[in-house]
């Protein structure tokens, strides 16, 4: 049974002269106002660096020609005979996503903290809870457990407050975004923003404002990327 490896769904395209995973040629299948960008495969796609970068390169090339795409995650493939059925069944959802994402790209923003400094700052305002038990050994053990728990809770609360402040400063009219708290020893804020292509410079200026306002953190900004985090694709 033949399968196809899917890179993305896009606005209507005629053809693409590109190679993808396993050095396979890129093909275009049209359905009404949509195109599915794929490669025909008859073997398992290996999860190796070359294939991952080949997948990303196809999406990057499509971004360069200014076409709206709905990107699929690396490693997505289906039976060839199911393609048209899926396009028919989910056509309206795909069109809605295309319309929503038209003229926009995803930009990633990450905030990196010095965990030791944060820990010290939190400890300066931290009052350790006390449990009163007559058995000294058990009492000390429980107090230490409670202290560790409450301290971690305080750090999480601190990270949440800081992340929300950063997120609110970045958001502006026409920008949508979402973030997750990482709470690692290095990165605590990992966000994605959907930015209009003609507003990327404005977005960069806004990030510089945030950087100057939060000098205790380092910021890593990457993109533009295909809008992985802002399209609703389930096949």
Language model segments and positions:
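Short, solvent-exposed beta-strand edge segments and adjacent coil->beta transition regions
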Residues: 188-190
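Long, contiguous binding/interaction regions
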Residues: 1-182, 186, 201-204, 208-235
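A short, structure-level motif marking secondary-structure boundaries and short turns
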Residues: 152, 192-193
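Helix N-cap motif at beta-to-alpha junctions
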Residues: 194-200
